[in-house]
Each structure stands twice: as C-alpha cells, then as structure tokens.
Curated annotation (Swiss-Prot):
SMART domains: Lactamase_B. Zn(2+) 1 binds at H63, H65, H140, D211. The active site is at D67. It comes from Cronobacter sakazakii (strain ATCC BAA-894) (Enterobacter sakazakii). Keywords: Endonuclease, Exonuclease, Hydrolase, Metal-binding, Nuclease, tRNA processing, Zinc. SUPFAM superfamilies: Metallo-hydrolase/oxidoreductase. InterPro entries: Metallo-B-lactamas (IPR001279), RibonucZ/Hydroxyglut_hydro (IPR036866), RNase_Z/BN (IPR013471). GO terms for molecular function: 3'-tRNA processing endoribonuclease activity; exonuclease activity; zinc ion binding. Binds 2 Zn(2+) ions. Zinc phosphodiesterase, which has both exoribonuclease and endoribonuclease activities. Pfam families: Lactamase_B_2 (PF12706). This is Ribonuclease BN. The gene is rbn. Belongs to the RNase Z family. RNase BN subfamily.
Length: 304
C-alpha cells in the first residue's frame, strides 16, 4: 500500500502546506484510490500528484470541520464533469449526507455516477476480502473518527525446491499448491500444498487519525500498526491550548505511537504558526519519545 499526503496543515493553508487530505493506494491489482478527508483545494493538490477525482472510489471523512470537508463538493462535481460513471462511496459522521445533499442541491449540481453516502458509528465499516476498515471515536468538539485499515494476511511462499526434490515439477499444479490445495499427481500420489508453504505473511496495518485530544481509544486504534498518521498541531509546551481545542501535541502523539507499538509515526496537521524550520523542532520533540517519527509534507508518498 502507498500513502500520499495532499495536505498537512491545520485549519488554514499556508504557502507550503494545504489543509488535510490523504490518498491511500491499496494496490494489490486494484485501480481505485481511497481518500481520507478532503479539505479545500484538494483537487488542486491532485493536479500535482498521481491522483485524479475519477480514480477515487471511496472517501472517508473523519469529521465535519471545514478544513477536512470543504473540498468535497467540488471533487464530486468534477467527477461528473469528467464523465465518470464508476460508483463512489462516502463514509463519515452524522451530517455528512446532509452536507453532500445540500451543497449539490443549492448549487444546482448533480452526479453522473452512483453516489452512496454512509453515516457511520464506531465499528467495522467494510470488509472486501482483502482490506477491512474500522472506525474509532476520538475526542474533538464535533463527532470525529479515526480509521484503521488492515490487509488480510497473505499466503506464504511456495517452496519450489522441496517440491522438485519430491518429484513435482513446475507447471499448472503449482498454482493450486500455492493456494494450499491438495493435488493428485500423474503417478497417483497426493501432495498437500499447505505442507510446502511458508508461514503466512502478515498484512499491513495503517491508522489514520482525525483531529483529537488525548483519548484511551488512540492506543487501541493504533495497536501494532505499520504506519500511524497522527496530528501534531502544537508543540509540547502548548498542551493546555491544544487539548482545550480537541487537538494533540507532539509529545502526546509520540506517546501514543510508543504505547501502541506502532512501527512508524507520520506527523501531520501542523499549525500554520510553524515555519519549515520550526517543524524540525516539532520533529525533535517526537523523536525524543518515539525515534521512528517523521514529518509529513505535502506530496510526500510513503510505501507501507
């Protein structure tokens, strides 16, 4: 999987950062992309990335503050203007359906494709056999969620050398054996593919947080993930101000990553008060607690 950050600023865009939007490319022979939040200007950011509105098949909104949703109506209309006919699924908190319906109706807009809007609560939202998405409630002045995305475990590798030693030559039967099936050879012997497979490879796990102050749910959401994306709106010394507005500091995000056993922390949602140089100080605050902390930048793409 790949994550591309289209916007990493909190509240207001700056000259170097747009407001929140993250694209997930699930890959695994999939052509569609998933979008997490859609702040104002997200379409413009897409012009500088590999994503286009027509490639988006699912949108997950964390909460209804403007810096996370004001880009949504334009993106929906652009899909229609481009002649897109593929369905689009939107997931978000209560009110997202009214927001979408109202903005389209009052602007005289419509969609040329099936649009399905799901108002969510805590729990698993989907399981398509390859990926699951689960929503966790967070602490913010409005209803807000974080999303945990998990790949299914992948089959182990087939030990071709052992099979050859057993007299099984490469051929069409190998595909069945890779699936762990039992096959019958021409000489009447049966071979169980599961006996020649290595242990399953664990699927990747990602946690994408919406805006949040400290909450016990955070560690559960991020438990053992490969990548944790968490807001670091303000520096550690401004915890009272950050928490009072439903936000987190560098120190608090790093503590969640450490306590959850995450492998990487991607810091995002920076107050526009911080310059690029000052963000390095924020990074140092996180790394002092959780060394595998990284600054997200607009257009940064990481492989999970």
């Amino acid at each position: 999987m790949e994550l591309t950050f289209l916007g990493t600023s909190a509240g207001l865009p700056s000259t170097t950062r747009n407001v929140t939007a993250i694209v997930l490319n699930p890959q695994n022979n999939r052509s569609g992309l998933w979008l997490f939040d859609c702040g104002e200007g997200t379409q413009h950011q897409m012009l500088r990335a590999t994503a286009t509105p027509g490639k988006i098949e699912k949108i997950f909104i964390t909460h209804l503050h403007g810096d996370h949703i004001f880009g949504l109506p334009g993106l929906l209309c652009s899909r229609s203007m481009a002649g897109c006919e593929t369905p689009l699924e939107i997931y978000g908190p209560k009110g997202i359906a009214e927001f979408v319906e109202t903005t389209l109706r009052l602007s005289g807009s419509w969609t040329s494709y099936p649009l399905n809007v799901h108002e969510i609560t805590e729990g698993q939202l989907l399981d398509d056999g390859e990926l699951t998405v689960t929503a966790y409630p967070l602490t913010h002045p409005v209803e807000c969620y974080g999303y945990r995305i998990e790949e299914q475990d992948k089959p182990g590798a087939l030990d071709a050398a052992r099979l050859k030693a057993a007299g099984v030559m490469p051929g069409p039967l190998f595909q069945q054996l890779k699936r762990g099936e039992t096959v019958t050879l021409a000489d009447g012997r049966t071979v169980c593919g599961a006996d020649y497979l290595s242990a399953p490879r664990p699927g990747k796990k990602i946690a994408i947080f919406g805006d949040t102050g400290p909450t016990p749910q955070a560690v559960t959401l991020a438990r053992d993930v490969d990548v944790m994306v968490h807001e670091t709106t303000l520096e550690a010394a401004m915890a009272e101000k950050a928490n009072g507005r439903g936000h987190s500091t560098t120190q608090q995000a790093a503590e969640v990553a450490r306590d959850a056993g995450a492998k990487r922390l991607l810091m995002t949602h920076f107050s526009s008060r911080y310059s690029a140089e000052e963000c390095q100080r924020l990074l140092a605050e996180c790394q002092a607690i959780f060394p595998a902390s990284e600054l997200a930048e607009d257009f940064l793409t990481i492989t999970v």
